[in-house]
């Protein structure tokens, strides 16, 4: 059964109805509409915690979608699923692919930084200080890039950069 027929709550149903209406009126080709339908079903499955189903839908959408910006958001959502599953390397790979297609995606830069920060903490707890510093430096690089793109966001990251001495004074302007 298609995911659009299984949504039980009002917001999901409303989103599905609106998405279906948009699909019908958009002046795009059939392949793009089909890609969007898979993407929409992937987001719905992801919201329900059905990560395997979400990945299947995102992979189908990625196969069909030709627009690089749309592909970047599909890759970003694939990365989110892998992040949720704790598969950090696969998540990093997909975030980087998304950035290759759409370099102005601060949320992907932020998520890469968050993963490196997490890996730095884990390395530090394991007593591997050199590896921890490498991850923290990577986190600082990616947060710096994210903040350059969205200077009013990522306040906690800005504070972390300042308190750890990794902040560059002119970086946010």
Swiss-Prot record:
Cellular component aspect of the GO annotation: plasma membrane-derived thylakoid membrane
Keywords assigned: Membrane, Photosynthesis, Repeat, Thylakoid, TPR repeat
Subcellular locations according to the entry: Cellular thylakoid membrane
Bilayer disposition of the protein: Peripheral membrane protein
Domain of life: Bacteria
TPR repeats: 35-68, 72-105, 120-153
Main location: membrane
GO terms under biological process: photosynthesis
UniProt xrefs under SMART domains: TPR
PANTHER family xrefs: CELLULOSE SYNTHASE OPERON PROTEIN C, TPR REPEAT-CONTAINING PROTEIN MJ0263
Xref: NCBIfam families: PRK02603.1 (NF002725)
Functional summary from the UniProt entry: Essential for the assembly of the photosystem I (PSI) complex. May act as a chaperone-like factor to guide the assembly of the PSI subunits.
Family membership noted in the UniProt record: Belongs to the Ycf3 family.
Protein name: Photosystem I assembly protein Ycf3
Organism (species): Synechococcus elongatus (strain ATCC 33912 / PCC 7942 / FACHB-805) (Anacystis nidulans R2)
UniProt lineage: Bacteria, Bacillati, Cyanobacteriota, Cyanophyceae, Synechococcales
This protein's encoding gene: ycf3
